[in-house]
Amino acid sequence: MRNDEWTYALKANTNLVGTLAHSLEWTLDSVDQSLITVVEGIESAGELSPSARMRDRLREVVRFESVVRLHALGNVVVINAQGDVILDSGSQEPRKANVADRDYFLAFKERGHEGLFVGRPVPSRITGVMSLPLARGFRTPQGEFGGIVLGAVRLSYFNGLFASVDLGENSGVNLFRNDGVIVSRF
């Protein structure tokens, strides 16, 4: 390969990586902002109950956050300290699921994680769709672990994003978490 061809290919790939990174960052940040808004609503209410008022507030937040316009996001759910779904943005009555054994739940309950936690890709216990879970914990008014707010990005979103780019022959994209866990491979 000639030097000018190599330089062009390098520049094109750098631009491609930058565009993909920006799109991924925007998506994950949008989901996180939705989770933050729900956590703040729960903590400011001073209670966690599956009341109609709380359910309506959850739907309102999810509906008006920009992330709902994305086909990437599944439902946002609120999970109590025992790991049970108690509020569900996608259903009047929360669908039954327990996530007490999942890494994103244990990070908050057992290890006191602060901030956003990106879980291992897993099939949703509610829909069965392979997803990347994103969670934020919340506290009770007494400062104890109250549960988590969970959103999930469908793995098909990543594959669709990567497929929309002409990667060229024998090329691929891998997306990893900070600890090396593969999120998506295309």
Predicted regions mapped to residue ranges:
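Extracytoplasmic/periplasmic ligand-binding sensor regions of membrane-associated signaling proteins
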Residues: 67-75, 82-165, 169-172, 178
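Solvent-exposed, acidic/flexible segments
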Residues: 10, 28, 51, 55, ...
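N-terminal post-signal-peptidase region of extra-cytosolic proteins
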Residues: 58-62
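Short acidic, glycine/proline-rich loop/turn micro-motifs
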Residues: 47-48, 88-91, 186
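Juxtamembrane extracytoplasmic/periplasmic/luminal helical "stalk" adjacent to the first N-terminal
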Residues: 1-50, 68-74
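Short, glycine- and charge-enriched coil/turn segments that flank and shape catalytic ligand pockets
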Residues: 48-55, 140-143
